[in-house]
Amino acid sequence: MTVLCTLMAFVMVVAISSLTVDAIPHSHESYWDQQDDIDRDEFLELLSRLSRTVMNRPEMENSKRGLDLGLSRGFSGSQAAKHLMGLAAANYAGGPGRRRRSEQA
């Protein structure tokens, strides 16, 4: 019985390994090509038009909905230090806040 099972398994392995299937040829058409996608001249024209729009409209500079590239009012280091000092003072037992009557006596 084991000889028959071993022989059958060997025949199956040989039959499966003898079948060769060629893969579909790989195509690069679905990849994004950075060189062909955006024309350099068009990109520079877009940037120049955007800068002219911002320069011609001074109210955009102080507007809430102006163009913000993340360079205007960020969270500075001194603000972070003040925040951490406030947290430390709030957690300190003798720090700011309302005093309990039991602590005042």
Swiss-Prot record:
Biological process, per Gene Ontology: body fluid secretion
Claim: Cell membrane is one of the keywords in the record: no
Span of the signal peptide: 1-23
GO molecular function: diuretic hormone activity; G protein-coupled receptor binding
Subcellular location: Secreted
Alphabetized InterPro entries for the sequence: DH2-like
Keywords: Amidation, Cleavage on pair of basic residues, Hormone, Secreted, Signal
Primary subcellular site in the record, as a coarse category: secreted
Modified residues (Proline amide): P96
Propeptide feature: residues: 24-63, 101-105
Expression tissues: Expressed in central brain, antennal lobes, retrocerebral complex and gnathal, thoracic and abdominal ganglia but not in optical lobes (at protein level).
A GO CC term attached to the entry: extracellular space
Function: Regulation of fluid secretion. Stimulates Malpighian tubules fluid secretion.
Membership in a protein family: Belongs to the diuretic hormone class 2 family.
Protein name: Diuretic hormone class 2
Provenance organism: Camponotus floridanus
